[in-house]
């Protein structure tokens, strides 16, 4: 039995060392985005290669600022006017593989992540932030990061093998300008059927 322990340890260690390491997300300012296996430029817009979803160049008054690739087929585009560091609202629009999860399971996972990351509690949908789409799951929360209070929400749908998700975040209490800008950005997002991919 004792001789089996070193062998088991060595086998486990070799499996651990041979396992692929999760890469860090790759964040690129929009002006520097080049075509890749995950996203391609489409004029001023960005096309998600796997799903064919088109990320617009702006959402309302919020221009696209950066593209993040989290892994194969897992892409987000960040939209903001002044940026979170300047106390402004921002919206992140995601397209990523749905895997084997239902949209209800995905929505539960999103809500748990928000609750854990922001120490957040469920809140009412802010006025003007209502959105409709087939199969839509959504939620809004009040939370904090350090000393700053935020109001943050998500909208998620499953389209075929893909999840489309909006994450909207505003300082809390939001100014009328931030609320209006964020509402316009959320309203501008297309959560309808995906285009036919080539």
Please place each PLM-identified region on the residue numbering.
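Bacterial N-terminal signal peptides
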Residues: 8-16
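Sec/Tat signal peptide C-region and signal peptidase I cleavage site
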Residues: 19-23
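N-terminal "mature-domain start" segment
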Residues: 24-80
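Short, surface-exposed coil-to-beta transition loops
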Residues: 73-78, 88-90, 147-154
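A short acidic-to-branched-hydrophobic micro-motif
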Residues: 76-109
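Long, charged/polar, surface-exposed segments that mediate recognition or autoinhibition
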Residues: 96-130
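Surface-exposed amphipathic alpha-helical segments
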Residues: 166-198
